[in-house]
């Protein structure tokens, strides 16, 4: 079974280096924005998706678009809605601006992932692509579509959801919403504030992928 990884905003493939599960391809956030991943998936008969952060948002989109093809879904710090509103715990525009600045700073040696020897999950991209990604995150709201999807029968495949309890980018309450959308999902809340969970719990993500019924087919 082919496993496709949908990466997060401003992130390089190195963020997945500690995960050992075999993957067919890691799609960058730019490839998500450009429709490359959608085109590839449309030509596959079946697949497993692993989506992190912005890639998790796209994984939710593709779950609704290709429900019969999708044979397993792993959501890592994923959210249907990144921004805060009256009834939703999310980021403020000011926090998003700080995230952009922090991402640029994190690319240097001071980033804790580099100092500790773990993969650095962030890589600098062009200003144009960074802005495109942020525009997507600011505008996207999949909550109503997901609620309608769940009401119509939802997914039949296994779903795993991993979320840090104190993540400052994707709030823990987001996982509760996703758990309601996918009532049979395995939801695991992780202690701490790490957003790039693939460098903290790679073995749990590996186990989730390998637990998919058709993983070895």
Residue ranges and their predicted role:
Residues 18, 171-180:
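Short alpha-helix in the alpha/beta-hydrolase fold that links the catalytic acid
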Residues 155, 161-163, 167:
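Short beta-strand/loop motif that positions the catalytic acidic residue
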């Amino acid at each position: 079974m082919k496993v496709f990884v949908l990466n997060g905003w401003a992130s390089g493939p190195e963020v997945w280096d500690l995960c050992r599960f075999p993957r067919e391809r890691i799609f960058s956030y730019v490839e998500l924005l450009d429709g490359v991943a959608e085109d590839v998936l449309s030509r596959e008969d079946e697949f497993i998706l692993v989506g992190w952060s912005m890639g998790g948002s796209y994984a939710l989109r593709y779950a609704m678009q290709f429900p019969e093809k999708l044979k397993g879904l792993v959501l890592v710090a994923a959210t249907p809605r990144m921004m805060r509103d009256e009834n939703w715990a999310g980021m403020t525009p000011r926090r998003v601006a700080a995230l952009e600045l922090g991402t640029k700073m994190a690319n240097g040696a001071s980033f804790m992932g580099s100092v500790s020897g773990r993969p650095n999950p962030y890589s600098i991209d062009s200003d144009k692509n960074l802005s495109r990604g942020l525009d997507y995150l600011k505008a996207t709201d999949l909550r109503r579509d997901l609620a309608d999807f769940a009401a119509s029968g939802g997914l039949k495949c296994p779903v795993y959801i991993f979320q840090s309890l104190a993540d400052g980018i994707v709030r823990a309450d987001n996982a509760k919403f996703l758990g309601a959308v996918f009532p049979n999902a395995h939801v695991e809340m992780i202690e701490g504030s790490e957003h790039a969970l693939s460098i903290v719990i790679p073995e749990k993500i590996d186990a989730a992928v390998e637990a998919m019924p058709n993983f070895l087919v």
